[in-house]
Amino acid sequence: MLLTRKGPAGPRAPGRFAASLEGSLARALPTMDRRTFLKRSGIGAGVGLAASQLSLMRKAQAKDPAAATAASAGKQVVRRTVCSHCSVGCAVDAVVENGIWIRQEPVFDSPLNLGAHCAKGAALREHGHGEYRLKYPMKLVNGKYQRISWDQALQEISAKMLDLKKKDGPDSVFFVGSSKHNNEQSALLRKFVSFFGTNNCDHQARICHSTTVAGVANTWGYGAMTNSYNDMQNSKAAMYIGSNAAEAHPVSMLHMLHAKENGCKMIVVDPRFTRTAAKADQYIRIRSGSDIPFLYGMLWHIFKNGWEDKEYIAARVYGMDKVREEVAKWTPDKVEEACGVPEAQVFQAAETMARNRPSTVVWCMGQTQHTIGNAIVRASCILQLALGNVGKSGGGTNIFRGHDNVQGATDVGPNPDSLPAYYGLATGAWKHWCAVWGVDYEWVKSQFASQAMMEKSGTTVSRWIDAVLERNDLIDQDSNVKAVFFWGHAPNSQTRGLEMKKAMDKLDMLVVIDPYPSATAAMAAMKVEGQEVNPNRAVYLLPAATQFETSGSVTASNRSVQWREKVIEPLFESRTDHMIMYQLAEKLGFGKQLVAKLKLVPGKGNMMEPEPESMLREINRGSWTIGYTGQSPERLKAHMRNMHMFDVKTLRCKGGKDAETGYDLTGDFFGLPWP
């Protein structure tokens, strides 16, 4: 049910930041020396200043001003989409009139967000009509961005790619994909990179939850959230360690608060007292990075008091005897020395988790973004195995991921060490996916520098700087990286800012593809002491459509897959990411191979692009390892139309058929989560 405003909306005052860009900041550039760059904290100020060179939109308007006056009398269309601000997967109904996204409502029947918005999700519409959209392709010329045509951009970029491939090999190009791409675009980008002849590709997961994926996979098979946000309502105890869900994943707290109403005991372990900690029954302040001593301290009390699930361990866990030996070394005094946590608090946490089963453990960036993040994650998993909580409703490890499709991009997207669905890079994996893609294995192999490089992991987003700056004998490929694509990713959240700037300046080509002019574009434009370090470098900005200007599927943190409907047409000269991939592949000479088993449909301006539905079916045909095989676009759309049929605790369909397709959804779990 839509809560519809009957009267017209009032005028909106321009934001202060927008006004400042149009005023004083717009006069501050075009150049900035190194000293000023450092004084203004490098990246943050640089973004705002360099943004004055870029194409920014002011306010969304109807194409026909006269039509805008009569817009309220026009037909309103409701499009169902999914919020892009975190991994909960909140469904949103977008109301479109006269081609403009005029209003939004949370989907009250959604079993994931239960009809709720958070402050971030409530501003979702701004992605369609925000002030800072990149309007048209641009190229950096003499320190300033100048407008160019799409034809010029694609021609020059593809020519440079082919030149670099001929002179330095395909591994001289590195592609950073995006956890904002939908599943279809993520899989297509991995295919695109493979057909160019390299494994040099990555995305945001590398610097957020790659430690989770590896740590959890090495503990019990696959690296993903074991249960669901909803299932936490069945937990009798929950320990948040390294997660501030109240601010990072606000809607997820609804499920925790429902659990607390049912008597769930909530523990928060964090160096900071957060908004999540404010809701806890027990708050424990540990020293940053001391997660493992704390978790082993809990296990020490669990083993000492015989609280471990002995039958579960005997039947289902291997190696717990080795864990006991290590845990025995972590006596309460050593734990307190390492963590700063008194024994009584550690004992209380252990007792709460042991006496209130099933109990769950929740973590996020606080555990993963450490040099030993993989080991921290495994320690959390071991705790749950000792308590016998894994594989049980209300238990497990509920791992809150960040972006709306970081799980899906990890599952099927541009990973440097695997093909879609974690197939690895061995010959058999390549032959499997070549058959799925409808291309000859020998042809794909011929695109690589060698079979050895074809089966070797590529450069990661956390080390691309080294791939550019280090001596060639210190990197594991024939050539240094000479060109980088930032395709929906801005690296300004990473460390080593000055080295990053040096790496950008050393590149032969830098391509930024994004709906917004990001910090990457701003850093690339900054001169060093008033001089252009590499005047021969080519820098391009290409306007991509947002995820609300295309359709496709996204995978929430609990692995439920949801289908987004296209809300509005791509604004200005922006194009969908999969259209850009296809058009670039055409220029590079493998356009036919890229879409060999895909259906082409008219997109913006009647230009052809791969159909998202056919891309998902290709994923279904190939992803047997993780069971991404039954999530057909038709069935996902049926789930989105019939959210009211799914239980808000179990996510299982209580019974009913989809009126449009006749599918019997009885027994389906919402979004058909794998495995």
Predicted regions and their residues:
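Generic extreme N-terminus detector
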Residues: 4-5, 36, 416, 423, ...
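Intrinsically disordered, low-complexity serine/threonine-rich segments
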Residues: 20-23, 27, 55, 362, ...
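Non-catalytic alpha/beta scaffold blocks inside enzyme catalytic domains
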Residues: 210-382, 386-392, 400-621, 625
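Residue-level detector of bioactive/disordered segments in secreted/extracellular proteins
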Residues: 85-88, 92, 120, 602-607, ...
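N-terminal export/assembly segments and adjacent metallocofactor-ligating motifs
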Residues: 2-307, 319, 329, 334, ...
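Long, low-complexity segments enriched in small/aliphatic residues
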Residues: 409-410, 415, 609-675
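Intrinsically disordered/low-complexity terminal segments and short unstructured peptides
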Residues: 3, 30, 35, 68, ...
